[in-house]
Amino acid sequence: MTIAVDRAARNSHSGFLEAGISLIAKRGIDNITVADISKASGFTRATFYSYFGDLDGLYAEIWMLYGRLWLEALAKDDLPYKSEADQLRCSAVLEIFIASKRKPAVLEVVTPTVSNWWNDSVSENKADQARLAWIVAGNIGIAISKHLAPSITNVKEIIALLRQMPSDPAVLEAMGLAPTPKTAPLQAVLRSLEVPEQTDEERIKTSTIEVVASAGVADASMTRIARNLQVTTGSVYPRFKNVSEIIGEAFNWGQKTIVEENTAAYATTNSNPDSYAAIIVGANSESRKVWRDFRLEMYLASRVRESLSKAMIPGLVEADTLLATFARKNRLPERHIDQIVGLMHALGLGFPALQNAGVDVQAIEHRIPTRYLVSVMNILKSSGVAASEFDHRIAARSVVPVIGNGDRSTTSAAS
């Protein structure tokens, strides 16, 4: 009798986990209920509550089972997408990871997992830290945005180049990639979207961004947006028909504004590879936290909301155009422009997700991978070698340093 009861308990527990994973992956983490999971699993809600307490308890347990494995797979470019069950599991863990920033009971298990994984995976070597952060951030960005831009998977070719980035300080020095100890990383000073001279419509869009950033798309409403502005709902409705319209317009406006400011900030620095590193550090500063969280929420929700995906496309197309123009001005190889733009988008999603989980993204020595990639791009451009055929061990023998003595640009993105 005891054996039968134990077996039934195991079956019901695993049944809830399997049903939860499937529903999170297919509907999105904000669009399921305990009743949905109970129905899909065939077990009662009372039994669910006895195991997990609430939905966040289920999410936490799924993360504890698969979170570390998922992070390790991201680092190896080896996400197990071979079976439908694997695909559902990866999608569910991704949703839990992104949404955990606003779910304290989930974040309290996500953060230690990420911390232990990070500490076990890196040494004091700055290049090793940067390589791991860029590869994992890039793969997170690809995973959360491929439904909007399937071609972003082409960024994996650039990630493969990053995997070849050397760690040996002597090799880095010979390639002109090692920042001198006396030079601290730059941080671009980037504004938040909220500035004093905003129009009424821009203030409403800013309020929308703040609400979605803190609560998610599913919990955003016209009432909440108005309340955040300290105005009545009637002040919002004349300008926007419904909450879906305002969320889409807020994304497109914010995306264009942020990209324009980032590219302008690049121009005010030395306009060399270190300048992009400075933008990464600035983009992950406190002034941009609301925008970062909003953007993550938009990608998360649009994965299962086709109407939201369609609303976001104009802003993404315009951002891609601006970034591609920026890349061409810096004379990066034409055949890799789309991949470079994709990498910028992917890192813009992956780094904030890692930072929310406790990785100090601003402390990463981003100058090493930015110098390395620009150096590699120059080699590919001059040699005609495909990125897939690149070997840094051969290239290192003849490479012109990206940064010269005193960290002055000798071969930059604009050369």
Model region roles, listed by residue range:
Residues 61, 72-92, 262-292:
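Hydrophobic alpha-helical connector segments
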Residues 1-27, 34-40, 57, 178-215, ...:
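Basic, helix-initiating cap at the start of DNA-binding domains
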Residues 41-52, 229-240:
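Short hydrophobic/aromatic patch on the recognition helix
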Residues 29-32, 89-99, 136, 247, ...:
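Short, structured motif recognition centered on aromatic/hydrophobic residues
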Residues 102-130, 288-289, 293, 306-331, ...:
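Amphipathic alpha-helical packing segments from all-alpha helical-bundle domains
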Residues 107, 124-185, 189-193, 309, ...:
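Hydrophobic/aromatic-rich alpha-helical bundle segments in the mid-to-C-terminal region
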Residues 24, 33-34, 55-66, 212-215, ...:
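Amphipathic alpha-helical segments enriched in hydrophobic/aromatic and basic residues
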